[in-house]
Swiss-Prot record:
Species this chain originates from: Haloferax mediterranei (strain ATCC 33500 / DSM 1411 / JCM 8866 / NBRC 14739 / NCIMB 2177 / R-4)
Keywords: ATP-binding, Ligase, Magnesium, Metal-binding, Nucleotide-binding
Domain GS beta-grasp: 14-105
Obligatory cofactor(s): Mg(2+)
Disulfide bonds: none
Binding site for Mg(2+) 1: E135, H245, E335
Effect of deleting the gene: No glutamate-putrescine ligase activity in complex medium (CM) in which putrescine is both nitrogen (N) and carbon (C) source, in defined media (DM) with putrescine as the N source and glucose as the C source nor in DM with nitrate as the N source and glucose as the C source.
Induction: Expression is induced in complex medium (CM) in which putrescine is both nitrogen (N) and carbon (C) source, in defined media (DM) with putrescine as the N source and glucose as the C source, DM with ammonium or nitrate as the N source and glucose as the C source, and in nitrogen starvation media (NS) without the N source and glucose as the C source (at protein level). Not expressed in CM in which yeast extract is both the N and the C source (at protein level).
Name of the protein in its database record: Gamma-glutamylputrescine synthetase
Cofactor remark from the record: Binds 2 Mg(2+) ions per subunit.
Record has ATP-binding as a keyword: yes
Length: 446
């Protein structure tokens, strides 16, 4: 859809009265304003007024009183009509994803969606177009009358028993995603009670990030209608974790990550990997942006505990998956395993793409791939292979981000500073409160 007449026609056909204008702040929490369908022309043409200060609220709706933004200052929330979707889980409602613009109509420097668009434009000018897909993990649970949590099945990953136990809820989620035009590729239960994973198709970075936000909204909304609560929190319980693996390749008519002469990943892919590894501690501040994230990024958690890469290695930060047989040229990609669903997906992709592009521009060579669980190596062996530990707290990751000029330039100084402010406030709240209290609140937010 490219104009408001198409949006209004679809709203009339499907009896839609309310349109949610969705956006996500540096906190990673999805926000919305809602307009009546009669206001859609005005919303697209002129935007909807939004306070600047919303961008520096953290996940708990708190902000630093010495913030760069305060009660004075407004911007415009500008819906993109091409992103319009009816919401099958919300009666007479639709949604559009939004950019944020200044009162003069220019892209606001603190808007993450506009910033990702700029990064992708710069890459396309160099002949590289990203293709991205998210693998989203989440947990379904319910509460009894006393508030006690019931996590459902105990069967484990890939078991048909687990599939049977939540079949109706998952089917309703998949139906709702497909009704919004989201390309669902795979689903399976995962390695802890009530944990599930949905994989969606490859798109441009912007389209993939947009769909990821719609998926998060859909899963939580449909699960609630089926009597569950869904959480994407990285470590919602004492056991089990939820990640968000990000699959990336770069294209220029053909897949630039595939070397047809050797049937292997290309030099471009290796340079991209090297760049991500080089900037990994700082990138993590964008892709694993909550205190809870670092409870997941531990050795032997099937996530990543160390900065390394490897073929088929699920304990490496970057895994090179096996390509589809007979479709190697189309399916060769890398999988970044250090992300989770508390991230603002636009910012996470900016970090990954900027780091990888820096590796290409500097023609970096990655270290040798790691073919074992890095936990099985001795300290001396890891040192010899150049394998370092990932940041173990959000504070450490933010320290790395604040000194990283490549990511500062990619985000732009205003967005960079606003993001650091929000996450420093989040880190400060954690250091002043109990971890169990944090997890309980974050489990509901994400």
């Amino acid at each position: 859809m490219s104009d408001t007449s198409t949006v209004k026609s679809q709203c009339e056909d499907q009896n839609i009265d309310l349109i949610r204008l969705l956006y996500v702040t540096p906190s990673g929490v999805i926000q919305a304003n809602t307009v009546d369908v009669s206001e859609v022309d005005a919303a697209v043409e002129s935007g909807v007024t939004l306070s600047e200060v919303i961008q520096v609220y953290d996940a708990f709706a708190c902000r630093n009183r010495n913030s760069r933004f305060d009660a004075v200052g407004e911007v415009h929330l500008c819906p993109d009509p091409e992103t319009f979707r009816p919401l099958p889980y919300a009666d007479r409602a639709g949604a559009m994803l939004c950019n944020i613009r200044t009162l003069d109509g220019e892209p606001w420097d603190v808007d993450s969606r506009s910033s990702l668009q700029s990064v992708e434009r710069d890459l396309r000018a160099k002949g590289l177009s990203p293709q991205v897909a998210f693998e989203s993990e989440f947990s379904l649970f319910s509460r009894d009358g006393d508030g006690k949590i019931n996590r459902g099945d105990e069967a484990g990953a890939y078991r048909t028993e687990s599939i049977r136990g939540t079949h109706d809820a998952i089917l309703h989620i998949v139906d709702a995603l497909k009704a919004q035009g989201i390309d669902v590729k795979k689903y399976h239960p995962e390695f802890s009670p009530g944990k599930h994973e949905i994989v969606t198709g490859h798109h441009t970075g912007l389209e993939a990030a947009d769909e990821h936000l719609l998926l998060r909204e859909t899963v939580k909304s449909v699960a609630e209608q089926d009597g569950y609560q869904a959480t994407f929190l990285p470590k919602p319980f004492d056991d089990g974790t939820n990640g968000c693996h990000i699959n990336v390749s770069l294209w220029n008519g053909e897949n630039q990550f595939f070397d047809p002469n050797h049937g292997d990943i290309s030099e471009t892919a290796r340079q991209f990997i090297a760049g991500v590894l080089d900037h990994a501690p700082a990138v993590l501040a964008l892709t694993a942006p909550t205190v809870n994230s670092y409870s997941r990024l531990q050795p032997r958690h099937g996530a990543a505990g160390y900065i390394c890469w490897g073929w088929l290695n699920r304990e490496a930060l970057i895994r090179v998956p096996a390509p589809a047989q007979g479709r190697e040229a189309d399916s060769t990609r890398i999988e970044f395993r250090g992300a989770d669903n508390t991230a603002n997906p636009y910012l996470g992709l900016i970090g990954l793409l900027a780091a990888g592009n820096d590796g290409i521009e500097r023609e970096l060579e990655p270290p040798e791939p790691v073919s074992v669980d890095p936990c099985d190596l001795t300290d001396a062996q890891r040192t010899a292979k150049g394998i370092k530990r990932l940041p173990q707290t959000l504070g450490e990751a933010l320290d790395a981000l604040e000194t990283n000029e490549v990511l500062r330039e990619a985000l732009g100084p205003d967005l960079f500073d606003a993001y650091v402010e929000v996450k420093r406030n989040h880190w400060k709240l954690f250091t002043e409160s109990a971890g169990a209290w944090q997890r309980e609140r974050l489990r509901n937010l994400y």
